[in-house]
From Swiss-Prot:
Record note on cofactor: Binds 1 dipyrromethane group covalently.
Chain positions found as S-(dipyrrolylmethanemethyl)cysteine: C237
Protein name, as recorded: Porphobilinogen deaminase
Domain of life: Bacteria
Other notes: The porphobilinogen subunits are added to the dipyrromethane group.
Entry cofactors: dipyrromethane
Subunit structure as annotated in this protein's UniProt entry: Monomer.
Function: Tetrapolymerization of the monopyrrole PBG into the hydroxymethylbilane pre-uroporphyrinogen in several discrete steps.
Keyword Transferase: yes
GO biological process: protoporphyrinogen IX biosynthetic process
GO CC entries: cytoplasm
Enzyme class, first EC level, given as a word: transferase
């Protein structure tokens, strides 16, 4: 079986972890990891918001799936657009890793204690708009590159800190580099942050059945709510967007955020309901955000206004 993935250190680590679990479950299975270069890997010097963001890191991998070049794709769920190409499916959703963002800084242990004017790097509009709301006195620096490249900027003193996803840091075994795990109450994660997606062709039902041992039902419900939220806002929405769903017992709570491209406006909402209503809850949260000012932000986006 051929498994398609990006070639970054994090993507390969994630894919090897999945491959190891598959090999443990099916010792006789022959596995081959196929590295596929994506548009996001090629266009490294352009801010993600300017080149479309969603889908940039998976398009070529999905094309390989559809062409039969690979049988299974391993993605970060947060890179997946709200709508999948016809003929593809999310075959399995493993248990979620830490969904939080983290601060890695050479000058301070906590975000609240950073000095005014500190230079903090991030490659995400979602993070930028929330950071500016939290600490408008900081200088937020746009940042591209792989995880190790971003962290190196701090070590080289080019930046006072970077904010990145905890999941990638943990999967790489770099948790000791973290100076603060930022609570989701302060910074909402991206849709699907911390979750891996195992994508296959819809026709490969036997393969989907074989991946069932990797499925985590709670994570699937949480991600289903988050992706319903994203879908209602518009799958290709380039506004800063965040959503995080948490299941506790039979209750599913989902919090969401939408911001403006100029990073000066941020709207947040929260709702909860039955775990059986994941899609409805995500959709309803998006509706509330749209009614609370998000629709105006989308209209400004269509008109070319910041």
């Amino acid at each position: 079986m051929k498994i398609g993935t990006r070639g970054s250190a994090l993507a390969l680590t994630q894919t090897r972890q999945i491959a190891a679990r598959l090999q443990g479950q099916y010792p006789e299975m022959h596995l081959e990891i196929v590295v596929i270069k994506t548009s996001g890997d090629i266009q490294k010097d352009v801010p993600l918001a300017k080149i479309g963001g969603k889908g940039l890191f998976i398009k070529e991998i999905e094309e390989a799936l559809l062409a039969g070049t690979v049988d299974l794709a391993v993605h970060s769920m947060k890179d997946l657009p709200a709508e999948l190409p016809e003929g593809l499916q999310i075959a399995a959703v493993p248990r979620r890793e830490d969904p939080r963002d983290v601060l890695i800084s050479g000058i301070c242990r906590e975000f609240d204690n950073l000095p005014a004017g500190a230079r903090i790097g991030t490659g995400s509009l979602r993070r930028s708009v929330q950071l500016r709301d939290w600490r408008p006195d900081l200088e937020i620096v746009p940042l591209r590159g792989n995880l190790d490249t971003r962290i190196r900027k701090v070590a080289q003193a080019a930046l006072d800190g970077v904010v990145v996803a905890a999941a990638g840091i943990r999967r790489m075994g770099w948790a000791e580099k973290v100076t603060q795990f930022i609570p989701t109450e302060k910074m909402l994660p991206a849709v699907g942050q911390g979750v891996l997606c195992l994508e296959t062709r819809e026709e490969d039902e036997d393969l989907k059945a074989g991946l069932a041992f990797l499925e985590d039902k709670r994570t699937r419900r949480e991600v289903t709510a988050e992706r319903a939220f994203l879908r209602r806002l518009g799958g290709g929405c380039t506004l800063p967007v965040a959503a995080f769903a948490e299941q506790r017992g039979d209750v599913l709570t989902i919090r969401g955020m939408v911001g403006s491209l100029n990073e000066r406006t941020m709207i947040r909402q929260e709702i909860y309901g039955s775990v059986e209503q994941a899609v409805d809850l995500g959709t309803e949260l998006a509706e509330r955000l749209l009614d609370g000012g998000g629709r105006i932000l989308l209209e400004h986006l269509e008109d070319g206004q910041p």
